[in-house]
């Protein structure tokens, strides 16, 4: 009888004691398979976690069996706001319950039979870990990539910290609030550490080309960087001795510019708004300020308001109105655009909405509807008429530069990265200041001091500012004050995949710039497969790629990119098809599933639900079906153990061996392609075949079936191997298939009696009815069933079915 609790507990203990998943160091073939490490929340694992973790585990187990040295680690992204807020509300220090949460997560992960090497475990709150985070920051500072700047930030007084745009939401009343806690957020100028990621924009774009990522994922990164090469052009103001600089990527359409649109934040707004429009513009800007940059850029409906002023088109001297648009960002380009409604979809909709002129300046050979967005030849463009779009771009850019109207430039949407948080629970900066605010880098580790009161202040000072004993120190006779801000949660996750490589079994780390580190990085980098949620598709990957490319540039790592292949698993939804949440009451607890049905059942079910990258609904009956299938597998093996089925030659050998060899080949292909659901389907088909036959030619078939099964259901597989007196999976190799069985000219005949399947037999293709019938009559089971019966009719379907109707 299949007792999952007994079997799973037994094998988890054996694996733990024997360090079965220790990182190999014997092969010249390596495979580094990585999960996006979790934030250890108090609620523990949810059923979404095992989906990605099981996928990487299957690959890790497969590669070990294929003779690879495998690095498959796990760790904890344990700094950050959630733990700190909980600590403040309960009056505790966040470290204590963070460690408790980690212990819970670790126990749950081990209960799933995941083959992590926990000697490689990392924790971002470990001083030995963040000492190296601090080292990277110091190197960034030395190269001018970490700077202090007075900038506008999203300030949340209640949380007492600056928030990234991604951490700010708009509530139902249109007000900015924090994602965590829904507290009010305002714009405030503060001095912050900033990392100059924009210096790496081109390198980050170039690096995408050679990566094995989905195009959609690459596109997300490209769009976030947002590189545009175009032309800056000055439009003189009609009534002021000033000009507005616009940025356009389509200079060839400038004769069709019928109005300008500027950002509500543009510095010229106050000067150019006429008195009769002031109040309306003021109200418009007030609504605009409620949005963050992401919401401004993503707005479907584009709104605007006329300033009352005009600019002069420098190419045709025509007077055109200046509008303010809520879709124009000051942070991109110049904060002003020339609007060409005949050749831009957004401008076309805007012009129709507000009754503005639409002037076509590009045509193609065919009649086209406006807006026409493709290239063609110029019309209504003075001496440039008749030029192709390509020729016009070159000529118009020459004209712009020759007449001092502007220049060709490249702009990026990417902004430099605000890297400070006014909170306690984060990595301290290895920085101090003297009385004149000169910066001093601190050698070695700056450890986060234990504090009872970690509540943030309302004035922007970090809680660390109140720890005077820690705050001040002397160096070389100078009194210095430590930086009291801490790094954001991103800091540790930027480089943790390197920390796994550096981690030693005794808990220490090799230094990032050591010779031993270089040797290890040469072996293990890049990460071969990285699996995690879609929510990290932009920022985490972009920030990690930035730090990695920097470390490459200073000679620390041997590869330009950290992650060769990235896969975003789909979301597991509730039984109602909705995202799981406490408020909907549709959360599934994986620990309860493991207890009731077993870890192997959960693993196989989550892989069988559908393609790894698709969203999938949880189905209670389906997971019970997987449990029944595992019971069926266990019972099948027992039938061979107790003699109900036997290991000996039979007429069905060729069929069994061809399907067995086909199974090995196909599972190998499916696993390499991450098609785990179809791989499991093939295992199910093979089990059905073994149930239909009474004999198989070799124990090797059962042994290797168990080895294949171990990728998906490792506990039951180990148990079955042990019952066959076979070695543990860690001491086995992946089975090979015999290609001669895959090139067979055989076909399977289903032999039926009165429509019921009684045997499945291999025959050479295109045998006659008489030949098939003669062979069928030699099968012992068929002979027995036909005793004292008369065949009154034979139904024959060539290469498929022989059905004997008897009385």
From Swiss-Prot:
Q: What class of enzyme is it?
A: ligase
Report the catalytic activity.
tRNA(Leu) + L-leucine + ATP = L-leucyl-tRNA(Leu) + AMP + diphosphate
The keyword Nucleotide-binding is annotated on this UniProt entry: yes
* GO cellular component labels: cytosol
| Top-rank lineage group of the source organism | Bacteria
Q: List the disulfide bonds.
A: none
Instruction: Map motif 'KMSKS' region onto the chain.
Output: 579-583
Q: Name one GO biological process term.
A: leucyl-tRNA aminoacylation
Record NCBIfam families: leuS_bact (TIGR00396)
- The entry's protein name is Leucine--tRNA ligase
């Amino acid at each position: 009888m299949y007792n999952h609790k007994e079997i799973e507990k037994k094998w988890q203990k054996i694996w733990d004691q024997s360090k079965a998943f220790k990182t190999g160091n014997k092969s010249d073939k390596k495979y580094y398979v990585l999960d996006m490490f979790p934030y250890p929340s108090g609620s523990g694992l949810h059923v979404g976690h095992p989906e990605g973790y099981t996928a990487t585990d299957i690959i890790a187990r497969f590669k070990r069996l294929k003779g690879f040295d495998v690095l498959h680690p796990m760790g904890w992204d344990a700094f950050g706001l959630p733990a700190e807020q909980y600590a403040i509300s309960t009056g505790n220090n966040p470290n204590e319950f963070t460690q408790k949460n980690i212990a819970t997560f670790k126990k749950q992960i081990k209960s799933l039979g995941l083959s992590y090497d926990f000697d490689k475990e990392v924790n971002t709150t470990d001083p030995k870990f963040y000492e190296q985070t601090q080292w990277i920051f110091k190197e960034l500072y030395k190269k001018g990539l970490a700077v202090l700047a007075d900038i506008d930030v999203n300030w949340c007084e209640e949380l007492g910290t600056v928030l990234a745009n991604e951490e700010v939401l708009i509530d139902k009343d249109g007000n900015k609030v924090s994602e965590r806690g829904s507290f009010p957020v305002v714009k405030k100028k503060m001095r912050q550490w900033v990392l100059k990621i924009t210096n790496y924009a081109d390198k980050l774009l170039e690096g995408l080309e050679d990566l094995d990522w989905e195009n959609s994922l690459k596109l997300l990164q490209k769009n976030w960087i947002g590189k545009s090469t175009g032309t800056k052009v000055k439009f003189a103001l009609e009534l002021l001795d000033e000009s507005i600089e616009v940025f356009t990527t389509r200079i060839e359409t400038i004769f069709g510019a019928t109005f300008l649109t500027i950002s509500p934040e543009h510095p010229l707004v106050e000067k150019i708004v006429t008195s009769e429009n002031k109040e309306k513009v003021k109200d418009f800007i007030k609504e605009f300020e409620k949005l963050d940059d992401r919401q401004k850029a993503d707005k479907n409906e584009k709104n605007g308001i006329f300033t009352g002023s005009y600019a002069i088109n420098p190419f045709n001297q025509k007077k055109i109105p200046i509008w303010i648009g809520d879709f124009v960002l000051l942070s991109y380009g110049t904060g002003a655009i020339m609007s060409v409604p005949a050749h831009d979809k957004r401008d076309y909709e805007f012009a129709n909405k507000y009754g503005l002129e639409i002037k076509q300046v590009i045509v193609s050979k065919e009649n086209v509807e406006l807006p026409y967005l493709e290239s063609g030849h110029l019309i209504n463009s003075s001496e440039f008429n008749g030029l192709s779009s390509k020729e016009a771009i070159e000529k118009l850019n020459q004209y712009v530069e020759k007449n001092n109207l502007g220049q060709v430039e490249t702009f990026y949407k990417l902004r430099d990265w605000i890297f400070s948080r006014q909170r306690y629970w984060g990595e301290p900066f290895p920085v101090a200041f003297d009385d004149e605010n000169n910066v001093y880098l601190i050698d070695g580790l700056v450890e986060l001091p234990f504090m009872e009161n970690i509540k943030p202040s309302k004035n922007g000072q970090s809680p660390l500012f109140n720890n005077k004993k820690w705050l001040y120190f002397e160096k070389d006779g100078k009194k210095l004050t430590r930086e009291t801000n801490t790094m954001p949660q991103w800091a540790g996750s930027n480089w943790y995949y390197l920390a796994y490589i550096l981690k030693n079994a005794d808990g220490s780390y090799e230094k990032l710039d050591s010779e031993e580190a270089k040797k290890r990085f040469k072996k293990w980098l890049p990460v071969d497969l990285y699996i995690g949620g879609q929510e990290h598709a932009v920022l985490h990957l972009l920030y990690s790629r930035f730090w990695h490319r920097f470390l490459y540039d200073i000679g620390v790592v041997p590869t330009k990119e950290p992650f060769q292949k990235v896969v975003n698993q789909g979301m597991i939804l509730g039984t109602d098809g909705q995202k799981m949440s406490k408020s909907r009451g549709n959360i599934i607890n994986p620990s309860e599933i493991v207890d009731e049905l077993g870890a192997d059942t959960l693993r196989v079910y989550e892989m069988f639900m559908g393609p790894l990258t698709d969203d999938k609904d949880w189905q209670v009956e389906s997971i019970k079906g997987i449990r029944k299938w595992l019971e069926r597998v266990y019972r099948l093996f027992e039938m061979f153990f107790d003699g109900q089925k036997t290991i000996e030659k039979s007429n069905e050998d060729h069929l069994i061996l061809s399907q067995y060899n086909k199974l090995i080949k196909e599972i190998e292909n499916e696993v390499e392609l991450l098609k785990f659901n179809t791989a499991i389907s093939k295992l199910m088909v093979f089990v059905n075949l073994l149930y239909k036959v009474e004999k198989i030619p070799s124990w090797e078939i059962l042994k290797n079936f168990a080895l294949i099964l171990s990728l998906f259901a490792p506990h039951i597989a180990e148990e079955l191997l042990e019952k066959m007196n076979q070695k543990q999976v860690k001491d086995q190799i992946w089975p090979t298939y015999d290609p001669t069985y895959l090139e067979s000219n055989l076909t399977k005949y289903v032999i039926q009696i009165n429509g019921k399947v009684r045997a499945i037999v291999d025959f050479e293709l295109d045998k006659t009815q008489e030949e098939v019938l003669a062979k069928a009559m030699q099968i012992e089971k068929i002979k027995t069933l036909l005793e004292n019966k008369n065949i009154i009719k034979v139904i024959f379907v060539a290469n498929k079915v022989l059905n004997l109707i008897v009385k």
